[in-house]
Amino acid sequence: MNKIQESFLYMLKVERFFSKHTLKSYHDDLVQFNAFLEHEHLKLKSFEYKDARNYLSFLYSKGLKRTTVSRKISTLRSFYEFWMTQDDTVVNPFVQLVHPKKEQYLPHFFYEEEMSALFETVEADGHKGLRDRVILELLYGTGIRVSELVNIKLEDLDLNSPGVKVLGKGNKERFIPFGNMCRESIERYLELFPPIQNVKHDYLLVNINGRPITERGVRYVLNDIVKRTAGVTDIHPHKLRHTFATHMLNEGADLRTVQSLLGHVNLSTTGRYTHVSNQQLRKVYLNAHPRAKKEK
């Protein structure tokens, strides 16, 4: 890793507020690129468009998914753009390289019956049971990311509205409302919160030692719930986020509103959930239209 690449990563951290996970991906992309340069006896500054095409072929030869290749090329394009701001003799060899098209996939989600089964499994009694229910209520009821969930502090809650303030990607703040069931679960949980708090902090969700729960801890909680729920498998925080978006659209929420609630920058990111919702539309159509009922 050379100085200009280190400066690039530093800029992403302090100016664009990239997460540790994203920064690691950018770092690994640059390390892989440097290894390619060394193997092919190429120089960073004299790297040309034809070399960029060869690198693209190299990535595909590794059997990588198109989404992964697209991200790696995007990293290098951004790096050279940054370098150009520092040195006007630098040319971006990736600027004309066409992005490989991303695979299209439908997000996995739970049906409403499955969500009901999950909630029925959680014992809303005692601190652990109440906490686990709050985790499930917030992830499904607001669609927030697990990273946003574990960073919720008491001051972020508004039990009057009710809703919660979270800090999303790019340090962007947003407020998400939630329903009465979620509010009641939080209120019951908070009644038992002060006695078990033996570490000074103001985070909402804690483990058995009173310390802030981690993302790994949340995943453990969800897996434990699924193990005790008949007919439900394969749970993870993002699947609950997918479920939130899908159910909102199925019940008539407009795409822009869901985009705002999820904290998506691009509407196209939210738009993938409409493909899932179209399944519900077709179900309604088949049940309602006289000429369509025969298609069943």
Swiss-Prot record:
Q: Name one GO molecular function term.
A: DNA binding
Under the cellular component aspect of Gene Ontology, which terms does the record hold? Answer: cytoplasm
- The answer on whether this UniProt entry bears the keyword Cell division reads yes
Where in the numbering of this chain does the Tyr recombinase domain appear?
A: 105-286
Please give the Gene3D superfamilies that the UniProt record associates with this protein.
1.10.150.130, Intergrase catalytic core
- Transmembrane ranges? none
Q: Which GO terms describe its biological process?
A: cell division; chromosome segregation; DNA transposition
Q: Where in the cell is it found?
A: Cytoplasm
Q: Which residues form the Core-binding (CB) domain?
A: 1-84
What is the top-level taxon of the source organism? Bacteria
Q: Matching PROSITE patterns, A to Z?
A: CB, TYR_RECOMBINASE
Q: Which residues form the active site?
A: R145, K169, H238, R241, H264, Y273 (o-(3'-phospho-dna)-tyrosine intermediate)
Q: Which UniProt keywords apply?
A: Cell cycle, Cell division, Chromosome partition, Cytoplasm, DNA integration, DNA recombination, DNA-binding
Any single Pfam family the record assigns to this protein:
Phage_integrase
Could you tell me which CDD domains the record lists for this protein?
A: INT_XerDC_C
Q: What is this protein's function?
A: Site-specific tyrosine recombinase, which acts by catalyzing the cutting and rejoining of the recombining DNA molecules. The XerC-XerD complex is essential to convert dimers of the bacterial chromosome into monomers to permit their segregation at cell division. It also contributes to the segregational stability of plasmids.
Q: Assembly and partners?
A: Forms a cyclic heterotetrameric complex composed of two molecules of XerC and two molecules of XerD.
Family as reported in the entry's similarity comment: Belongs to the 'phage' integrase family. XerC subfamily.
Official protein name in the record: Tyrosine recombinase XerC
